[in-house]
Amino acid sequence: ADLIRVLEHLLATGLALRGRRVPFRPIEGRLRRIRVHGTGPLGGHLATSLADAGFSVTRSSGRPSLDHPVSGWATDLVVLTDYLVHDTMLIAGLMDAGTPHLQVRMRDGVGIVGPLVLPGLTSCLICIDLHRADRDPEWPIVSAQLVRVAGHGRPAATRATAALAHEHVDQLAEAIRSPDRAGLPELFGRTVELHSEPTRIVTKTWAPHPLCRCRPAAAVG
């Protein structure tokens, strides 16, 4: 199976890029191997939940290096957990390797799941940073101070966020397994925020940023 029909939906909704500047590596057949990258309770809960559901789960937390590059990770999906901001070298490595990835974190007690990135086909984490910098010129400075800093939330909220992330991994797995029947995974170009007091869910849409390197060469400049 492939993601052709899923990508057609993405193009129709404007969440995908026409053409590629970085290579997307298709997930063949089914989503099986997942790497949970990050240190903290959120990653722990999610890794346990995914393993119990039958996925082959690998844990990691270190920075990539020349000896251990991201391109060497044998995985179908990387879930970036816990850290408010992940290492720029890691993000660049995932994009260059064409590895699908999902960000999951706690921020000031709020659980945030997404976006789900298909490199070169959907908006990416750098797109979000560029959008935030457009609104707040100080964001690049703030972001640099948050690299590998774990967010925190109440234990129940953390478990609920892990469960929500697992649900969206299942959505992707179903879209790959049965593209004719499954709906479009909700987190392509979107984040879902789980708030409490009062309990509510907020969805935000992130379009591809015109200055991001993930855009096709023809669309830049």
Annotated model-derived regions:
Residues 66-74:
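Short amphipathic alpha-helix with an adjacent loop that forms part of the alpha/beta core around
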Residues 57-67, 102-109:
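A generic structural motif
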Residues 1-20, 25, 73-78, 82-221:
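Glycine-rich phosphate/adenylate-binding loop
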Residues 22-62, 162-169:
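Glycine-rich adenosine-cofactor-binding loop
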